[in-house]
């Protein structure tokens, strides 16, 4: 009888139900979609190779192995969806909404430039999660036009989302 108990406990994961209770069902679905985007090889675990591939797809081709290892080491073990959700839950406890949104964008900006490519942001917003319409994209670019190099200042977008107006320069 004991092996069944141990097996069930291992499969269920201690405390895993707690992390799911921290989020609304819609938030869990959004995190699942983000996890699926990052899990490039679809094996249910985010690896260094998955991170390298997703960053390369965003134009970040020169990410060092040490940087990838540091990202992976933030977890206590293999990063499955429950661990991924737990990591976000821990980071979001008591966090300022603007910081939370900026942190989400920073995942797409490993070099810390404060901006991301317009084409990449548009692709994400029109193909993932709650897809933006052409009209919504037009309105976004009217409100937050990219610079001459095609970069979008995501920190300004985050400020407006959380404060409702642009910062005074």
From Swiss-Prot:
Where does the chain cross the membrane?
none
Q: Which UniProt keywords apply?
A: Calcium, Metal-binding, Motor protein, Muscle protein, Myosin, Phosphoprotein, Repeat
List the SUPFAM superfamilies hit by this protein, alphabetically.
EF-hand
CDD domains, per database record: EFh (cd00051)
Q: Which InterPro entries match?
A: EF-hand-dom_pair, EF_Hand_1_Ca_BS, EF_hand_dom, Myosin_RLC
Q: Could you give a single Gene Ontology term from the biological process aspect? A: actin-myosin filament sliding
Residues modified as Phosphoserine: 21
Disulphides: none
Pfam families, sorted: EF-hand_6 (PF13405)
Q: Name one GO cellular component term.
A: cytoplasm
Q: Where is the EF-hand domain?
A: 26-61, 96-131, 132-167
Query: Which positions bind Ca(2+)?
Result: 39, 41, 43, 50
Output one GO MF annotation. Answer: calcium ion binding
Deletion phenotype, per the entry, is: Reduced trunk contractile force and complete pectoral fin paralysis. Muscle weakness is most pronounced in an appendicular muscle and is explained by reduced myosin activity and fiber degeneration.
Q: Which domain of life, per UniProt?
A: Eukaryota
Q: Does the keyword Calcium apply?
A: yes
In terms of PANTHER family, this protein maps to: MYOSIN REGULATORY LIGHT CHAIN 2
Summarizing the function annotation, the protein's role is:
Myosin regulatory subunit that plays a role to maintain muscle integrity during early development. Plays a role in muscle contraction.
Q: How does it assemble?
A: Myosin is a hexamer of 2 heavy chains and 4 light chains. Interacts with nanos3; the interaction negatively regulates mylpfa phosphorylation.
Protein name as annotated: Myosin regulatory light chain 2, skeletal muscle isoform A
Which source organism does the UniProt entry give?
A: Danio rerio (Zebrafish)
